[in-house]
């Protein structure tokens, strides 16, 4: 759908002499032309044209060999600039090969004839990599030479090759003969691999008899189009080593011109077709088989002088005696994009590096034409953004309004036929007029929203074209149009015309000449902006018709640019031919394939298959371009598109972007950023209905209707409801509500910074909206929108199912005809079984019956079920319904209200463990509450809560049960106190105290056992023993001294303290020995690991773990599907069992810490940690023991114990803590996991008794 737009049509100054050939110096961007070899000048003159268009003579020379013996002057067969020797190579028809130095040293000759080819040169051509030189001699031989002119091969062009290689077979793919047309269609029996007519290779009447050579773009093959004996034309293909690869099949009317597509797919030549009196471009594959064609739309006898592909293989130039046609292709259709008038028999040449630069060489001048392939579409605003795209195809203009219909090319919505080949086209700013022109005529068409295109008029512009070359066309506002032309001396001029429909005349509104070359123009708000060849922008005010001074420019000239109005300023956006996108002087992105501007965005596609959006702001520096990884963050300003996609048009009113794929087809997408922008615009305008429809169409979260502006929404609830109006739309909105604010996440407004975004937080948002909308619907649309009202109940959190059912109950009582619809709607929103249960919970059997009728329940089941309830008395019915619904607490309440049902009440309470509820129901009936409390106490004791049971028993006067419960709970104080209060039996009290003392000793509660012996058993000796065992030495001393029995103090207490001292000393010694042995072993292990870590790791094999068992985790985390979650066995479950088994084995090895394994160090370190914990645990006990020893005059033992224990704690600080500060090398760290930072315990010094030595 692209058109060829001319940026530059420059005529170089005249060269003195007749130009014979042209060559390009891509290194310094210079051009060399050869003149002479005619009657006026039999010698050779070479001129150099610099990049600044300065013409200077490079060299002039002559040689006797340039003129033959019979007086004929030699001809140039090829001219090539060679980069490595920095020389021009000329091959002459007489056989001379001349090398001309472009920058010779003083001692070098500027030119040299390096050799002569015997029998002359018929054709010659250098390969594109300048490494191989191919020559066809007059002796029917083909020579392949290196760049140093060493012969690679010399082969005779034998006619026998035609017979040997003329065995082309086509299997007929794609032909009608090979297509299946139905089994009943009788087809003529024939071989589909053979054509119906076999060409003999008859020569065209306009064949010039010349031989052409053309290399493939990668220089691996060369093709030769020459006359063979017969005579017929044949294309031979040779490898760069000189081996014949193929010969083309014969074609009637084939001409001599030849051009190999640089991409290498096909060879192009021209054929005169007498069957339809036309000329065609036909294509051959490298193997010589035909591969497509297209008509040149010319007569059979038309003479063609040139055929050339541009370097990018996108344009095919075909020249006749007085014009050059430029063809492009897309979707298997060939478009005639431009036809340029040229001097008689001029030569055409494409620049070898600049793909869209064409040189036309006349007799004594050179024209340079620079094109750009671009979509003809202009910056337009809503609602005039129809996406009107005109496509030039010869004398036809193919027009498609993409907003109304997306028709892939080459098809179109309108085909406008003109009397001339269209050179340029444009649409105006409001997309209601279309213009087409060549260099003499301008035609205008009108377009309206009813999809009609009518001819407005045709106007003569030839009177303005004298000395100018019209190159581009730009529609302005209304029926105004701008024509841009290039003149001589690298200057430009523009005309602004107004088309008059009445007299079909043009009114010149403005005109201006520029001394510099203008590449292209843009129109914006009655301002014209022109870009010079240096990238500078010039503005022209159409209102005052004068040039205004502006400081806008691009760093480099842009092949396409547009000026966008943003907040009363102008922002120029331009794209260079090298894919660099600029906003004035700022580089926005590189690798850009296409761009488009709307009122709010700059859109562009990149070579990384991304479509990006940039919010337009008035300051260029504030334009934010997201990085490529933004697509992974789901940023709305970046999205993935198909590879090679280019933007054709963007239509903000449709929120659409039309992309064209490399193969030519169109695709319309709706980017989220444009859709959201449209939704926000609708919300601001209170067009909630339109915003809702957009969200519904593009599957946006409907919460944005509220979250974007909650205050605006809450103030305009009637507007919102009236905008949606339809019940199903309101239902959809209500069911889509959720508590989250979508504008803070996926739908955040990226045009604002985080500080600019104000987020209004609404607590309980869903319930609030449901309530407000329900209130409005109830007051205004209660009779028609009952369905939406029900939805509002069910969408609250939690759902108000009972309220909705209550509403339906009201409809039933009112005998409304909408009851069935309401119930059906509820069954759609909520599980019908749940609704049935809730209806039962309301004790409304009629409502439950109606709901059951909407379900899949069997009437033979639910009808008797409901009938059974219907027969029961009201309280019994409610009780049974609550039991069915497992609402046991409610059922218990109904049971309490029944008469003579207290026993059933107690049994029901016991059955369902409803003791707290039962106590609450009878909180004002003390007798009943007492009975409930007794059964509750029984339950508590049976479930291991004897302490609570004992309290309950005691509160209701069940003393014996309370005593037993207290004993079970070990609460000796409560047990003995209640026993002393209720009985005078000393024996019973003593027996109970003995039992309790024994229980305390079993539970290692020695202090409690001592208290019982002292207070209730009058056994001070046992009390002293138990107090010492409980480390309560001070209490033991007090009891011993209080008895007044010296034997208890001297014999028993001293003896028990001695035992405690011995146990403590033994424990401290064990600590010391463990610290010594384990710290030494850890240091040894760490030293070995440092010296030989591999051997340390191999220590894991000492336990003879089988080789096929991995100790590392191999568990897989997979999500179960709906089907696999119910299977009995699977590979993953087996693997889980195996892995769990390995993990348990690994933990057992870790716990053992076997010597020599990788687990040993970890085991020893953990053992030291446990030792420190044990030392800290007994620290207060040792301190109390020291005090007791001193008080009993056992200072020697106290000093010894204090010294040893203090030494242990000191050793821990000196030796153990440094070891614990180093991360432990566990089995996991050996497998590559990161070690965890160690937790070092804080061990304080032991607080000694200062009175001890």
UniProtKB/Swiss-Prot annotation:
Residues 1142-1153 have a biased composition (Basic residues). Residues 1126-1153 are annotated as: Disordered. It is found in: Cytoplasm. The keyword Cytoplasm applies. It comes from Schizosaccharomyces pombe (strain 972 / ATCC 24843). This is Elongator complex protein 1. Belongs to the ELP1/IKA1 family. GO terms for biological process: regulation of cytoplasmic translational fidelity; tRNA wobble base 5-methoxycarbonylmethyl-2-thiouridinylation. The gene is elp1.
